[in-house]
Amino acid sequence: MKRFEVWVIMKIPEYVRVVNNLGLCVIVTPDELNNLTSLLVAPMTTSYEEIPSRVSCNFEGAKGFIMTDQIRAVEKHCFIKKLGELESGVQVNLCDCIQEFFAY
């Protein structure tokens, strides 16, 4: 599991208000912290909302958004399947958005 990989994860029902318990996410944890039991992820969605904290991306032919305002820790056992990796331009945009979102 590496930074910028896109995974299908099993959502924790107590924290999610949707019926489907699977979702796409991008790993945002730096690779140096991969020895931890959980990783930080940013969920992905195809629903558009005009929010500055959403990063536009195309993945597997579908236009979507990475929700940096929804970053959360997920235990490694919840990761189901790796689907691929973000393009380098999207990786840069994602890092820029996270830095701006958490700027002081």
Which residue stretches match the model-derived regions?
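Conserved functional hotspots at enzyme active or ligand-binding sites that engage polyanionic ligands
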Residues: 1-104
